[in-house]
């Protein structure tokens, strides 16, 4: 009998073991869809980004005009740009849901998978930040100025570091050129890191909502979950196409329709919505270095999740107290996102400070304590 190429060919065999014959727990829910959704987001972003890069000019005098030209004169250029800009929002929605799932179901106990995932998040945030600068509108320019300036808070080397990043004494042509180069490069780095992330995941296999081993009862990924994933793709592309076709500028800042002008500062400098929670934490501390450290800690705190797990149960499925805290954390992040979009004045300052404090308190103190308390209640 002729050998099955799917199982014998060295390259096809790898694809088969990752996407077709992969043994998968039979009880994983829709929350396990987000990994593949992130994959399709990345593919969409790379494709639309490549098409945009063909018409873009990374020069301060031409960048804004080249984006306008793409939208006006290139066949379906407006659609490609709208898909790329709103695709970033979908990407972040998916990654935040994916991380939330990981925290709720204790997936962070797969330490290597979790840590590579956080590195992926940081790379994605860097990519989105440098990408936002490229249209060279007012918010692009001032966002780049404000965020890169934060590095000057680093003692001793800060100022040198910022001028080195800028390629001069302010955000100018060299900055735009290097940001374009980075924005082109980083998605391919993300693709490479994704493969590492998956390699680590397939070492242990997927977690499941019960948090117990499922080695005794697994089903092949295809056709069961491949079909379920395609449903997920359709449900994700629906809001993406709706945004891109009906309200393409809903999530953008109107300031970015004005070409960058170093002499005019916008009244409210703020990043895209998916960074607002971190921006609110940054602003809640009245000291520059303190703010930068809090900003870094707001994401890097995820590295501590495996160390802060004190419960004898892996998931929160049967832990109502931890569940309440988890949803409190989600609400807290929504409040931070809202506060980040508001001007720096009363009452937003105090709301932001309280929300920032409760964010760190919940993750560092309340969740581990509740885990230990639940062990006691259940006589573990």
Curated annotation (Swiss-Prot):
Q: Single Gene Ontology BP term?
A: mitochondrial electron transport, ubiquinol to cytochrome c
Compartment(s) of residence = Mitochondrion inner membrane
What's its membrane topology?
Multi-pass membrane protein
PROSITE patterns hit by this protein: CYTB_CTER, CYTB_NTER
Arranged from A to Z, the UniProt key words for this protein are: Electron transport, Heme, Iron, Membrane, Metal-binding, Mitochondrion, Mitochondrion inner membrane, Respiratory chain, Transmembrane, Transmembrane helix, Transport, Ubiquinone
Coiled coil feature spans: none
What GO annotations for molecular function exist for this entry? metal ion binding; ubiquinol-cytochrome-c reductase activity
Q: Please list the disulfide bridges.
A: none
Query: Pfam families, alphabetically?
Result: Cytochrom_B_C (PF00032), Cytochrome_B (PF00033)
Residues recorded as binding heme b b566, renumbered to this chain, are 98, 197
Q: Which sites bind a ubiquinone? A: 202
Q: Which cofactor is recorded for it? A: heme b
What sections of the protein cross the membrane? 34-54, 78-99, 114-134, 179-199, 227-247, 289-309, 321-341, 348-368
Say which domain of life the source belongs to.
Eukaryota
Q: How is the cofactor bound?
A: Binds 2 heme b groups non-covalently.
Binding residues annotated for heme b b562, in chain numbering: 84, 183
Q: How does it assemble?
A: The cytochrome bc1 complex contains 11 subunits: 3 respiratory subunits (MT-CYB, CYC1 and UQCRFS1), 2 core proteins (UQCRC1 and UQCRC2) and 6 low-molecular weight proteins (UQCRH/QCR6, UQCRB/QCR7, UQCRQ/QCR8, UQCR10/QCR9, UQCR11/QCR10 and a cleavage product of UQCRFS1). This cytochrome bc1 complex then forms a dimer.
Family in the record: Belongs to the cytochrome b family.
Miscellaneous comment as given in the Swiss-Prot or TrEMBL entry: Heme 1 (or BL or b562) is low-potential and absorbs at about 562 nm, and heme 2 (or BH or b566) is high-potential and absorbs at about 566 nm.
Q: What is the name attached to this protein's record?
A: Cytochrome b
The organism encoding this protein is: Falco peregrinus (Peregrine falcon)
